[in-house]
């Protein structure tokens, strides 16, 4: 009987063993400080496997930090590990995600070390055959891709980074465009700006292109004054502003091509659901010309984080376009003297070969290559940069290897309003909308809407080589951009000018005198101190706000030499067949200094031309 009981008990245990144990699921949440505020990660683990990860950070930069939140979460699930690679383009957000993920596992009662195995990517070599290959998925690259695809061409875009956008996604202002319907919604009040530009022409009496443009604009201005209908601007005035801003060394033909095609570019962008309808003032522009996006409340938003996700969506929804991310181009393939493809390296170290009938370089400049910057312009050694990590000048180097010529390589722009602690770009649009700059003594020191090189030089000459950008509540109420700066912790505030001075360590009495004087200048529409002609509204609505800014490397005006068809030229001035370039990888357009708003104009106009020309060549 005892033996039988034991046998039955054994059978029962065996039967119970056949029933799987209930899966154990635990969830934990952790938080860490990101770029714009708290980043929160929630991780769910079932039977020792990461089954769900959500990463949230409402104030992380759209198109940069927001992509890191998505990509790193997916990588953790795929690899069952929190030891995933940080995104070089979003290091602060990435590090916050990794720190918060570790805290989430601890909160779930788990050991983070058990989920920290490094997963090595494995991939085979790959070969593709397409009509057009584009290197770089920034604004120029995606514009070119969409344009070539419109012509029915198959396109591959190679992007070295894990996110699209390059420097374009970091653009904060808008797009300059001349003689547009959006401009005509404004009442013209920029007489002083136009006349100031015309009065400056004597400085450029030896520059034939500027002299001719000046004569044309003077005739246009006289005609407008005789019959002031609509808003005054013209292609030629945009050209003139661009040439003067570039100190007259610009390629006049390329400047004309850009300016003449901006209005059409604004219209074309609507096909990708991009609408730039708010028109404002920017440094170096005689009139209101910069076209900006607005949110659902009508408040201005940063142009890059608005445009680039829409461009990316348009590319991904186009059956003719393939995006290969984290794929770094190394070599331009040549056959019988013509470009015919790209050899690249994938994330896993595998070789990716793209055979194509035409090649477009849209890799951006080299503003993140601080060694290269210092070599070309030693006085910029030690400066911070606003540039995306991938802006290393690799496209220029690849093209030079096949005989391409470069131009203006030592023309490197610094931007005067870079947030002093993070190198985040503070939009020039705030100065165009009425903001002022004061130094450590609480005093203005320059026409704030002058060209970037002039404002930067004046700022560097101040105590500590920094300044404070001052705005008021009325400006904040109209701008989601300023609201974003507040959320990121960039902003100091005070209910009075005196209180703001105390908050930023500036003499309150001096700041109060400066602001009251400025508000009087705005009312009179006259700045006898520095000759500013763009005033907007007085800064007299409390509370008042200040952002500490300094100069940082922002744009490289030099690059590959191209013609009006975006064909890359060799060192003898001849076309390299099949090779095109657009965007910051090129040189000659902006001369010695780029005007704010012209980078987007550049990549839209020349991206479209490159896409159309490459598509035609591929026929």
Label each residue range with its predicted role:
Residues 347-350, 354-419, 606-609:
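Glycine-rich loop(s) and the adjacent beta-strand/alpha-helix scaffold that form part
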Residues 83, 88, 463-547, 613, ...:
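Helix-rich C-terminal "cap"/substrate-channel and partner-interaction subdomain
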Residues 122-140, 156:
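Beta1/beta-strand and adjacent pyrophosphate-binding region of the FAD-binding site
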Residues 201-213, 392, 396-400, 404-508:
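An anion/pyrophosphate-binding glycine-rich loop and adjacent beta-alpha core
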Residues 233-350, 370-371, 522-541:
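Conserved redox-cofactor binding core of oxidoreductases
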Residues 24-119:
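Active-site- and interface-proximal helix/loop "cap" or "latch" segments in soluble metabolic
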Residues 331, 510-593:
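A glycine-rich dinucleotide-binding beta-alpha-beta segment and adjacent secondary-structure elements
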Residues 150-171:
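Glycine-rich FAD pyrophosphate-binding loop
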């Amino acid at each position: 009987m005892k033996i039988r009981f034991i046998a039955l008990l054994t059978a029962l245990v065996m039967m119970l063993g056949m029933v799987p144990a209930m899966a154990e699921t635990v969830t934990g949440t952790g938080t860490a400080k990101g770029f714009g505020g708290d980043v929160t990660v929630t991780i769910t683990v079932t039977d020792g496997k990461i089954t769900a990860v959500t990463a949230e950070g409402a104030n992380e930069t759209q198109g940069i930090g927001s992509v890191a939140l998505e990509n790193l979460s997916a990588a953790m699930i795929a690899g069952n590990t929190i030891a995933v690679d940080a995104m070089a383009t979003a290091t602060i957000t990435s590090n916050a995600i990794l720190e918060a993920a570790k805290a989430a596992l601890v909160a779930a009662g788990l050991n983070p070390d058990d989920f920290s195995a490094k997963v090595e990517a494995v991939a085979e070599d790959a070969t593709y055959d397409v009509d057009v290959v584009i290197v770089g998925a920034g604004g120029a690259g995606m514009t070119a891709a969409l344009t070539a695809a419109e012509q029915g061409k198959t396109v591959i875009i190679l992007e070295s980074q894990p996110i699209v956008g390059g420097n374009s996604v970091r653009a904060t202002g808008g797009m300059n465009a001349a003689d547009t319907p959006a401009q005509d919604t404004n009442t013209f009040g920029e007489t002083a700006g136009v006349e100031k530009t015309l009065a400056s022409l004597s400085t450029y009496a030896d520059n034939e292109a500027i002299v001719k443009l000046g004569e044309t604009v003077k005739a246009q201005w006289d005609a407008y004054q005789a019959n002031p209908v609509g808003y005054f601007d013209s292609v030629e005035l945009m050209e003139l502003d661009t040439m003067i801003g570039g100190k007259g060394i610009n390629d006049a033909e390329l400047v004309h091509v850009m300016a003449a095609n901006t209005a059409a570019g604004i219209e074309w962008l609507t096909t990708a659901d991009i609408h730039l309808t708010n028109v404002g003032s920017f440094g170096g522009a005689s009139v209101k010309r910069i076209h900006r996006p607005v949110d659902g409340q009508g408040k201005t938003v940063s142009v890059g984080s608005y445009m680039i996700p829409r461009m990316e969506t348009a590319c991904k929804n186009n059956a003719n376009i393939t995006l290969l991310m984290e794929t770094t181009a190394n070599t331009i393939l040549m056959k019988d003297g013509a470009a015919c493809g790209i050899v690249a390296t994938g994330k896993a170290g595998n070789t990716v070969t793209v055979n194509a009938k035409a090649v477009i370089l849209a890799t951006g400049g080299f503003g993140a290559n601080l060694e290269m910057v210092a070599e070309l312009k030693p006085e910029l050694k030690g400066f911070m940069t606003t540039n995306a990590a991938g802006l290393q000048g690799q496209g220029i180097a690849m093209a030079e290897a096949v005989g391409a010529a470069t131009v203006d390589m030592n023309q490197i722009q610094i931007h005067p309003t870079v947030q002093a602690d993070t190198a985040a770009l503070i939009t020039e649009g705030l100065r165009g909308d009425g903001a002022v700059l004061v130094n450590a003594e609480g005093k203005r020191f320059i026409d704030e809407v002058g060209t970037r090189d002039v404002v930067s030089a004046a700022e560097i000459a101040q105590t500590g080589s920094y300044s404070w950008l001052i705005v008021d509540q009325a400006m904040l109420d109209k701008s989601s951009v300023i609201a974003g700066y507040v959320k990121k912790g960039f902003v100091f505030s005070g209910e009075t000018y005196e209180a703001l001075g105390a908050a930023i360590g500036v003499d309150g009495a001096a700041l109060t005198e400066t602001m009251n004087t400025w508000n009087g200048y705005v009312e009179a529409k006259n700045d006898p101190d520095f000759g500013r002609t763009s005033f907007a509204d007085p800064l007299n609505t409390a509370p008042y706000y200040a952002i500490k800014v300094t100069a940082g490397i922002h744009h490289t005006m030099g690059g590959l030499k191209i013609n009006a068809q975006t064909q890359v030229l060799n060192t003898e001035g001849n076309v390299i067949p099949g090779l095109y370039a657009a965007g910051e990888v090129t040189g000659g357009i902006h001369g010695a200094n780029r005007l704010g708003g012209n980078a987007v104009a550049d990549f839209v106009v020349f991206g479209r031309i490159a896409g159309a020309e490459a598509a035609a060549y591929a026929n």
